[in-house]
Amino acid sequence: MTQCYAEITGWGKCLPPATLSNHDLSTFLDTSDEWIQSRTGIEQRRISHVNTSDLATVAAQHAIACAGVSVEEIDLIIVATCSPDSLIPNIASRVQQNLGIPSAAAFDLNAACTGFLYGLETATRLMQASHYRHALVIGAERLSFYLDWTKRDTAVLFGDGAGAVVLSKTEQKVGLQDAQIGCDAQGRDILAVPKFGTAMDRFDADNGYWAFDFVGKEIFKRAVRGMGAAAQQVLARSGLSTEEIDVVIPHQANIRIIQTLCDLAGIAQDKAFVNIHRYGNTSAATVPIALCEALEQGKIKPHDDLLVAAFGAGLTWGAGHIRWGERITPLGKSDAQLPSCDHTALDLLSKAIEHCKRHQSE
């Protein structure tokens, strides 16, 4: 039986238009542009005026056009998200409905910030083992929904957005060649929204507020350790030296984590694609957005070897080796875009900010 692979043939992104700058944050938090940039590398982030599935749909439309396939050819949809519009049904079915895809398998996957890499591994192995020809893998988040806007440690970090890729079955040795994904469950409580779901008291009058637990120093240590070990395992199995890695697409959580990951892996920092300054941490969306922009900016060349690495709540972690194919430009383009937004980011967040302030004062 001929070995098959899953080539990335399409890529797309969706960033909501409303931008929340560090200066904007300083109008209601005890922080400053210098404080945020020096610790995270973030200058601004996007705040969505639409649901997560809307972001996912637009990113998917661009990826499908880029791949030059019709929606009828998509037979597998995986949406990686930890901020879905609804738990029942999944938002992959909403994306499928929005796109007019007739009967594809569609499901959500929650591995937090590592979700896209989990989804890429899952889709690739399903395509290799079964009949699927074209898969749509999306990372989409609206994390602004979760945040306590009185807590500086998390309010400055996260943003909203979506990225998507189309995978197409091929006999060429391209696409995700190897991946190492895992979870350090001993650290599951240091990055968590612990009472969102059936753990929540549904009759509590204060259901609009929930804790977002975040232990930054411990997260940093575990993130670097998990991603670094996974990257070393992937490189060893792929038979690649660090010099042979052309581009690193890391999870965009913190510029210091990206730099430390490269140092531990022995890879030059200038090989890492970085856009955290523009969007902050968009969780499962960071890797596909970064991949899309690396292609748009000409950072990825035909036949390049890419190292992808991520970590997230759980604490999930992972790394993967992607061998790029021949094509680095879109076959087609889509004019898909979000509905217009006449509000600033501060306008969109005004009720949430006031609610969080009231809760803190009680």
UniProtKB/Swiss-Prot annotation:
EC number, as in UniProt: 2.3.1.180
UniProt catalytic activity: malonyl-[ACP] + acetyl-CoA + H(+) = 3-oxobutanoyl-[ACP] + CO2 + CoA
Record GO biological process: fatty acid biosynthetic process
GO MF entries: 3-oxoacyl-[acyl-carrier-protein] synthase activity; beta-ketoacyl-acyl-carrier-protein synthase III activity
Pathway: Lipid metabolism; fatty acid biosynthesis
Transmembrane parts of this sequence: none
Gene Ontology, cellular component aspect: cytoplasm
CDD domains the record matches: KAS_III
Active site residues according to the UniProt entry: C113, H251, N281
Keywords tagged on the record: Acyltransferase, Cytoplasm, Fatty acid biosynthesis, Fatty acid metabolism, Lipid biosynthesis, Lipid metabolism, Multifunctional enzyme, Transferase
Compartments (UniProt record): Cytoplasm
SUPFAM superfamilies: Thiolase-like
Pfam family, one: ACP_syn_III
Location (main, coarse): cytoplasm
Top EC group: transferase
Region (ACP-binding): 252-256
Family listed: Belongs to the thiolase-like superfamily. FabH family.
Role: Catalyzes the condensation reaction of fatty acid synthesis by the addition to an acyl acceptor of two carbons from malonyl-ACP. Catalyzes the first condensation reaction which initiates fatty acid synthesis and may therefore play a role in governing the total rate of fatty acid production. Possesses both acetoacetyl-ACP synthase and acetyl transacylase activities. Its substrate specificity determines the biosynthesis of branched-chain and/or straight-chain of fatty acids.
NCBIfam families according to UniProt: fabH, PRK09352.1
Domain description: The last Arg residue of the ACP-binding site is essential for the weak association between ACP/AcpP and FabH.
Subunit relationships: Homodimer.
Name used for this protein in its record: Beta-ketoacyl-[acyl-carrier-protein] synthase III 2
Protein source organism: Vibrio cholerae serotype O1 (strain ATCC 39315 / El Tor Inaba N16961)
Lineage per the UniProt record: Bacteria, Pseudomonadati, Pseudomonadota, Gammaproteobacteria, Vibrionales
Gene: fabH2
